[in-house]
């Protein structure tokens, strides 16, 4: 039911206090009318005396005496259909590509419906990103939420665009889509993402939601929810496997902190609201698979760690909720290695659910484990060499140092347009393992060595 009020008592920054509203709902949409101009807002807090509303377009020019507030009795919704594929929207679901609104099949609440834990199906099946450091050693699984922890100046935007353009499921019979949400990005970054999707042709199977740095703060809070509402529709009503990429969650959390400060809430760690964990969970937990549904939602949230601090509240809380992490390394970046993924610091907790016979290849797990062990030993020997000099190393230590160097330059490093299949990734792994004596391949069964190593040698 629509209710109209002319009882605005205070305008404070982006916030408006409307008195005499006792029945407003949290998240309810509000229209403000001033001299024929209409602005939109959302209820952030409600009491028996007043409602606190944040205005999307800002409050400049709003005056308490001449502004009318209309409470619309509904929350934010997004009109969905398969026509949203190939489109670019702003952070509030309005077309940004100059085209008209797509045909609407239905309107869905951007907050979605909570998944019953009993109805969830365990994440499984392999998603190929075309990036060896992920596919080979930190495999992404359908229904998983696997964040990328980056830092200022690292190429996470390029990596996100590459994953979005290359990712696919191996079965050609299953439909795949990408939902991409960017929060607080610059105009230059927005152009980069749009051009990257168009150049690779990935735009045809993708939906983009772009919130710019100069857009209202409250829009930044809504952007990932619009994206996930679109993802849920495509996954659970159109039977698609959807990869949702959310960047940059640090900008999202900064918006949370800004709104919390404007509401004069008691701050938590480093000024972030105490409910940030719950708020992040309401986004990350929308990934998954549902029993009886063919589709799935896989999430890759991307965040920049302030001052590269992994104990910062944003990466810390994200790590608790998600199922692993991909770390980008400044050291590898300084070596001009792209993508600079630190495979030893990275982890995919659900990797074993999506690899092996019937998913990728029978030797995948063994090759991955051996690469991890050999690379770790090579890095240890490299550090020892720095402290004590090369003379302190044994011949085997020197071999492992060479192995570590080649793994970084041949396995981790790849071109920005290089899309490797899982077979190519494993072949590179076997080629590197060939450097080591057979007696050192202790994590691989003899039958796999006999089957795959000769192929590499030939």
Curated annotation (Swiss-Prot):
CDD domains: ATP-synt_V_A-type_beta_C, ATP-synt_V_A-type_beta_N, V_A-ATPase_B. The keyword Transport applies. Keywords: ATP synthesis, Hydrogen ion transport, Ion transport, Transport. GO terms for biological process: proton motive force-driven plasma membrane ATP synthesis. It comes from the Bacteria. GO terms for molecular function: ATP binding; proton-transporting ATP synthase activity, rotational mechanism. Coiled coil: none annotated. It holds the Pfam family ATP-synt_ab. Produces ATP from ADP in the presence of a proton gradient across the membrane. The V-type beta chain is a regulatory subunit. Belongs to the ATPase alpha/beta chains family. PANTHER family: V-TYPE PROTON ATPASE SUBUNIT B. This is V-type ATP synthase beta chain. It comes from Coprothermobacter proteolyticus (strain ATCC 35245 / DSM 5265 / OCM 4 / BT). The gene is atpB.
């Amino acid at each position: 039911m629509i209710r109209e009020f002319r009882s605005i008592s205070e305008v404070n920054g982006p916030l408006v206090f409307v008195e005499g509203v006792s029945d407003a709902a949290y998240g309810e949409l509000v229209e403000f009318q001033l001299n024929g101009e209409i602005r939109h807002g959302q209820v952030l807090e409600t009491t028996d005396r007043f409602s606190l509303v944040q205005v999307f377009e800002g409050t400049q020019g709003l005056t308490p005496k001449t502004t009318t507030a209309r409470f619309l009795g509904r929350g934010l919704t997004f009109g969905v259909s398969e026509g949203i594929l190939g489109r670019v929207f702003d952070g509030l679901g309005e077309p940004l590509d100059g085209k008209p609104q797509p045909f609407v099949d239905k309107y869905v609440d951007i907050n979605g419906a909570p998944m019953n834990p009993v109805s969830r199906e365990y994440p499984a099946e392999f998603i190929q990103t075309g990036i060896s450091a992920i596919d080979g050693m930190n495999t992404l699984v359908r229904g998983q939420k696997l964040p990328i922890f980056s830092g200022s100046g690292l190429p996470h935007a390029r990596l996100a665009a590459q994953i979005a353009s290359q990712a696919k499921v191996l079965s050609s019979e299953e439909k795949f889509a990408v939902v991409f949400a960017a929060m607080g990005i610059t105009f230059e970054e927005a152009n980069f993402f749009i051009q990257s999707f168009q150049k690779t042709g990935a735009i045809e199977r993708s939906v983009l939601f772009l919130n710019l740095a100069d857009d209202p703060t409250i829009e930044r809070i809504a952007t990932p929810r619009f994206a996930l509402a679109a993802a849920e529709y495509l996954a659970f009503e159109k039977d698609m496997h959807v990869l949702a990429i959310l960047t940059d969650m640090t900008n999202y959390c900064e918006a949370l902190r800004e709104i919390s400060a404007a509401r004069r809430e008691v701050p938590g760690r480093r000024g972030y609201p105490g409910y940030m964990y719950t708020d992040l969970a309401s986004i990350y937990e929308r990934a998954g698979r549902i029993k009886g549904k063919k589709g799935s939602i896989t999430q890759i949230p991307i965040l920049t760690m302030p001052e590269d601090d992994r104990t910062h509240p944003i990466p810390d809380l994200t790590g608790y909720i998600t199922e692993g992490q991909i770390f980008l390394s400044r050291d590898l970046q300084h070596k001009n290695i792209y993508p600079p993924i630190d495979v030893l610091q990275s982890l995919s907790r659900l990797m074993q659910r999506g690899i092996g016979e019937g998913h990728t290849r029978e030797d995948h797990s063994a090759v991955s484990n051996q690469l991890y062990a050999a690379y770790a030993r090579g890095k240890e020997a490299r550090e020892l060499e720095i402290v004590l000099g090369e003379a302190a190393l044994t011949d085997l230590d020197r071999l492992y140092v060479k192995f570590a160097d080649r793994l970084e330059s041949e396995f981790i490093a790849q071109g920005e347009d290089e899309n490797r299949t899982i077979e190519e990734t494993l072949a590179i792994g076997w080629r590197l393992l060939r450097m080591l004596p057979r007696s050192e391949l202790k994590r691989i069964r003899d039958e796999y060595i006999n089957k795959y190593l000769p192929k590499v040698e030939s």
